[in-house]
Amino acid sequence: MNPKHWGRAAWTIIFIVLSQAGLDGNIEACKRKLYTIVSTLPCPACRRHATIAIEDNNIMSSNDLNYIYYFFIRLFNNLASDPKYAIDVSKVKPL
């Protein structure tokens, strides 16, 4: 399934989940939700790529919400189909 059809919605949900964790402080619930989202992406290649990136960066064992947040920003920027969609990290405030 082509990420052009569902990618923006998936990224929006990912960043909403991260923002909610910034408000309620429940990092473990946030990580579970993020892993569920990533492990159920409709594109098998996207699912594999994101899961490997999460494992390689020890996201599930981190208790630092901002580490997780900036990881997903970097992942988004690496996958952005057009540089104009990239998030300027210098303008992002920590959660």
Swiss-Prot record:
InterPro entries: ERV/ALR_sulphydryl_oxid_sf, ERV/ALR_sulphydryl_oxidase, Sulphydryl_Oase_FAD-link_ERV1. Its EC number is 1.8.3.2. GO terms for molecular function: thiol oxidase activity. It catalyses: 2 R'C(R)SH + O2 = R'C(R)S-S(R)CR' + H2O2. Its cofactor is FAD. It is found in: Virion membrane; Host cytoplasm. Residues 1-8 are intravirion. The chain crosses the membrane at residues 9-25. Gene3D superfamilies: ERV/ALR sulfhydryl oxidase domain. Keywords: Disulfide bond, FAD, Flavoprotein, Host cytoplasm, Late protein, Membrane, Oxidoreductase, Redox-active center, Transmembrane, Transmembrane helix, Viral envelope protein, Virion. Residues 1-95 form the ERV/ALR sulfhydryl oxidase domain. It is an enzyme of class 1 (oxidoreductase). Signal peptide: none annotated. Disulfide bonds join C43-C46. Induction: Expressed in the early phase of the viral replicative cycle. One of its GO terms (cellular component) is membrane. Residues 26-95 are virion surface. Pfam families: Pox_E10. Belongs to the orthopoxvirus OPG072 family. FAD-dependent sulfhydryl oxidase that catalyzes disulfide bond formation. The complete pathway for formation of disulfide bonds in intracellular virion membrane proteins sequentially involves thiol-disulfide transfer between OPG072, OPG128 and OPG088. Interacts with OPG128; this interaction involves formation of a transient disulfide-bonded intermediate, allowing disulfide bond transfer. This is Probable FAD-linked sulfhydryl oxidase OPG072. It comes from Variola virus (isolate Human/India/Ind3/1967) (VARV).
